[in-house]
């Protein structure tokens, strides 16, 4: 997702490529413009605006606005309309393309999350898409971060024409990322949650929340 990694990924594309998915990360102002020129995304997905690299920005609003530069020329942007910072930055950005919002609070959002139910190691999400499709999908995760990431994924997939049935099948087949909330059995009845892939205040909070949700 860096100034080096993104160009290397773009070079892997050829005439047989139908879809390419890039993560674009920044650590200071001015970096996103370079990534935008390289990626030139058709669809932009805003995941979360955390505390990583916050020391290089005057405010979290500034960082969010910097990230939104990536989507200036994108045809579609998918975002969480419940996030006040993201919603405010979207309005300030002057973006004129198609906006696809997901929300747990606004029934008028393109993807409205009606209900989220956690059962042991599984999460069931009930949703309405474009006020007409009512369906459900299952996730093999229970942590809040993974569940919320699935909302953006679902909104994008449904927008691209994936059926609710296909979405449910693929969501249920997702696998954990290595070193991200990995549960390992320790000695003498101890349980270890390995979240060493990356760590900041936000990810630590997610790990503690995940630990408190576990049935054991």
Regions found by a protein language model. Name each.
Residues 177-179, 196-216:
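Active-site beta-alpha connecting loops in nucleotide-dependent enzymes
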Residues 34-49, 216:
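Inter-motif core of Ras-like GTPase G domains
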Residues 37-38, 72, 91, 213:
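Solvent-exposed polar/charged
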Residues 1-16:
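Active-site phosphate/ATP/adenylate-binding loop shared across adenylate-forming ligases
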Residues 17-32, 192-198:
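Switch II (G3) loop of P-loop NTPases
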Residues 43-191:
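Acidic, Mg2+-coordinating active-site environments of NTP-dependent enzymes
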């Amino acid at each position: 997702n860096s100034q080096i990694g993104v160009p290397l990924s773009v070079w892997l594309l050829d005439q047989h490529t139908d879809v390419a998915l890039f993560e674009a990360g920044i650590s200071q102002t001015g970096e996103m413009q370079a990534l935008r020129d390289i990626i030139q995304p058709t669809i932009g997905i805003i995941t979360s605006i955390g505390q990583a690299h916050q020391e290089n920005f005057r405010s979290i609003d500034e960082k969010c606005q910097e990230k939104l530069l990536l989507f200036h020329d994108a045809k579609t942007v998918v975002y969480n309309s419940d996030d006040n910072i993201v919603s405010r930055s979207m309005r300030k950005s002057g973006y004129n393309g198609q906006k696809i919002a997901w929300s747990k609070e606004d029934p008028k959002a393109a993807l409205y999350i009606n209900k989220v139910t956690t059962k042991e190691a599984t999460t069931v999400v009930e949703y309405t898409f474009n006020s007409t499709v009512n369906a459900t999908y299952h996730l093999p995760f229970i942590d809040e971060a993974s569940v919320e990431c699935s909302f953006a994924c679902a909104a994008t997939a449904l927008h691209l024409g994936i059926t609710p049935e296909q979405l449910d099948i693929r969501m249920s087949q997702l696998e954990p990322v290595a070193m991200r909330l990995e549960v390992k059995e320790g000695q003498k009845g101890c349980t270890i949650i390995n979240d060493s892939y990356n760590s900041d205040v936000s990810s630590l909070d997610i790990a503690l929340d995940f630990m408190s949700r576990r049935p054991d």
